[in-house]
Amino acid sequence: MKMKSIIVCASLALLCSAADVHALFGLDSVQSAAGEKVISALTIDLSGLKYYSAPKEALAPLDLLAKEATNLDKNISCSELEPFVDFVISNAYTGLVWELPCSNGVFGAMAVGVLTNTFEERKLFCSPTLPDHAVYSTLRFSKELSSRGKDICEKMFSAPEGVLTRDYSLNYDIIAPNEVSGAYYCYTNTRIYVQGTVKGRRVMMTGTLMEEPSSVSQKGALIDSKYPGLYFYSTEKGLTLPGAGWMETKMDYYRSFTISVELDNDRYAFATLSWLSAGWKGINVLRTHHIYEVLREIIKELQTYGGSGLDLDELQKCIASGENLSDDKVEAEYKKYCSFCEKKAGSSFLSVNVDAYKRIFNKKDLEDLPKELRRALVVQEQVRILKKTPTWSISE
């Protein structure tokens, strides 16, 4: 069996949440800086897109931030971010799709564009006190391990203008399964936070640096295609992909960054980029277009928060309510999820690959699920209800 298309990783960045407003937000095409039309990524196969090479000099500030991620004594000035900030601003409206320099066999992709949120709202999505799994369906679970979230928020959100402020935390994450391979992974990472003013514009950045290779892949599957982002998680190692169930894969390398640059009229230029290597026995089977596919899905999800009329204060309250539910209430809600899973596993009318879900369904996995993962499921569903897209909590 060829390895090339076995794995397309389910998630790239914990805070990878942005987009190219032209090529990704539904326009048929846009005139690029080079005078050619870039077709919408929503209407063609992404592997056929025209990729432009991101200049190494523009990415140099990211190497510096990664190198000094945990060395807060190192003085990094706002001016040192200028090459990357200038690149993002100058390409925010071009609609171009970017590939990153390949290093040691690791490929990467980047999207640059403009989104509609106030800069204050953008801060919310960069907050280490907001569990990422409550916002992005590409994550099963996310936890800040260093217990410094509130301190980091106070430091970042009260930072004086003109001064580059940095901090970091240690995080643990479990990504959602990929719908092709059925693989999901767990890993620890260093999350970095950066805020400052560059050429008179407020800038906020986050980065994710994987500490070591991920856990071995475990099997997962979409429960029903009517409910994107709703998965069943097996504890069995391997892939759900038929014929490759025995294959135990890993994420070997992962690094990502996002940047928000304040523009005007409640708009900001945004770039999100990731390098990722994943595969079997050190063989990287991911390519640029695989990575960009995942960026696109995260981008589409962010649209439900930006310019949709969703009250972000209500979102915060909704998440806090779920995080503070009693254990008994969480258990009562979790039973609804279990009933939903069992019902779907016994149905012959699923609008999804029935074999994939039925093949891995095991009631014992539901019974043995740790409490913190049960709570995460409940919080995710409460957010869906707020967005008017409930799944397992409704009767069918």
Language-model segments: what does each one mean?
Residues M1-V8:
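Bacterial N-terminal signal peptides that target proteins for export
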Residues V8-C16:
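Bacterial N-terminal signal peptides
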Residues S17-A23:
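Sec/Tat signal peptide C-region and signal peptidase I cleavage site
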Residues L24-E396:
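Terminal "cap-and-tail" regions of soluble proteins that handle hydrophobic small molecules
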